[in-house]
Amino acid sequence: MTNIRKSHPLLKIINDSFIDLPTPSNISSWWNFGSLLGICLVLQISTGLFLAMHYTSDTATAFNSVTHISRDVNYGWVLRYLHANGASMFFICLYLHVGRGLYYGSYLYKETWNVGVILLFATMATAFMGYVLPWGQMSFWGATVITNLLSAIPYIGTDLVEWIWGGFSVDKATLT
């Protein structure tokens, strides 16, 4: 006599996905960070889009628009806090995910590890682009902190920083 969860078509899908999932015996909570990264990324994109609908980057009105988001937009303060803390949580999960890979020796799988390194560099490049380039909404402080190390290169450092910034667009409290 077979169990209904293994013979019924719909229950068989659930059984194979959740109950009899073919996973290694050493799986632990360390293996959740890839999924948590996806959740954090969806959270960042969705809250960022809603915040961008109400934010103005002009130096005279930027603070007022943030105040408007916090006071007048329904649950705007929640969006701000989720977006700010979601960014920190994203990078915590990212570093823990890399740390788990180092701990369990995943670097021995060269192709998989190289894809992960490329994704890490792409994440850092995307974070830079998100800070500096779109809509002129990032602060002068953020752009200078991220590119500060490049300015220490002799002879070409300042020109390299200006080239990465995209010219002289970085000169005020916000990039407009």
From Swiss-Prot:
Binding site for heme b b562: 83
Disulphide bridges: none
MF terms in GO: metal ion binding; ubiquinol-cytochrome-c reductase activity
Note on cofactor: Binds 2 heme b groups non-covalently.
Location relative to the cell: Mitochondrion inner membrane
Pfam families: Cytochrome_B (PF00033)
A biological process term (GO) from this entry: mitochondrial electron transport, ubiquinol to cytochrome c
Membrane topology recorded in Swiss-Prot or TrEMBL: Multi-pass membrane protein
Chain segments annotated as transmembrane: 33-53, 77-98, 113-133
Keywords of this entry: Electron transport, Heme, Iron, Membrane, Metal-binding, Mitochondrion, Mitochondrion inner membrane, Respiratory chain, Transmembrane, Transmembrane helix, Transport, Ubiquinone
Coiled coil: none
UniProt entry tagged with the keyword Transport: yes
Domain of life: Eukaryota
Main location, first listed in the record: mitochondrion
Keyword Heme: yes
Its job: Component of the ubiquinol-cytochrome c reductase complex (complex III or cytochrome b-c1 complex) that is part of the mitochondrial respiratory chain. The b-c1 complex mediates electron transfer from ubiquinol to cytochrome c. Contributes to the generation of a proton gradient across the mitochondrial membrane that is then used for ATP synthesis.
Subunit: The cytochrome bc1 complex contains 11 subunits: 3 respiratory subunits (MT-CYB, CYC1 and UQCRFS1), 2 core proteins (UQCRC1 and UQCRC2) and 6 low-molecular weight proteins (UQCRH/QCR6, UQCRB/QCR7, UQCRQ/QCR8, UQCR10/QCR9, UQCR11/QCR10 and a cleavage product of UQCRFS1). This cytochrome bc1 complex then forms a dimer.
Entry's family note: Belongs to the cytochrome b family.
Protein name stated in the entry: Cytochrome b
Provenance organism: Corynorhinus rafinesquii (Rafinesque's big-eared bat)
